[in-house]
A protein has these predicted regions:
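One-carbon transfer enzymes
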Residues: 1-132
Length: 132
């Protein structure tokens, strides 16, 4: 089965793609890369701590497999439906985990597919709140 994954580029997001591949499925991965921002020191420390925690959980072979069919796009551009999305739509199932909010034409296209939306928060308003 070809599993499409639309996600971000944090360790927990990469781990999902690695694990699906480890379980024997082909993976087509689109990762959104966030823009570098100037955060306050407290926020920087928080994300360093999250990164370290994820590193301790998602280490080992099944969590760190390189995905051959991997594409990166700038965060927030997914709704402009880049060419990679056409390939994503050919997948047997699509998993959305940690991506930008999906709307417009992309939402319409995805609504005709088998899609699993993994969202840790209680509301899209908390997007990026690292609800884990």
């Amino acid at each position: 089965m070809l599993v499409g994954i639309l996600t971000s580029n944090q360790k927990r997001h990469k781990a999902l793609a690695s694990y699906v591949n480890y379980m024997g499925h082909d993976v087509f991965l689109i990762q959104e890369i966030p823009k570098t921002q100037n955060y306050e020191e407290g926020i920087i420390k928080y994300f360093i701590d999250v990164n370290e925690a994820e590193g301790s959980i998602f280490s080992g072979d099944k969590w760190t497999i390189d995905i051959e069919n991997s594409h990166s796009i700038d965060k927030g551009l997914i709704n402009q439906v880049p060419k990679e999305v056409d390939l994503l739509l050919e997948c047997d199932v699509i998993v959305i985990f940690g991506s930008s909010l999906i709307k417009g034409q992309l939402f319409q296209k995805l609504s005709t597919k088998k899609v699993i939306n993994l969202h840790m928060g209680i509301s899209p308003e908390y997007l990026g709140a690292a609800c884990n």
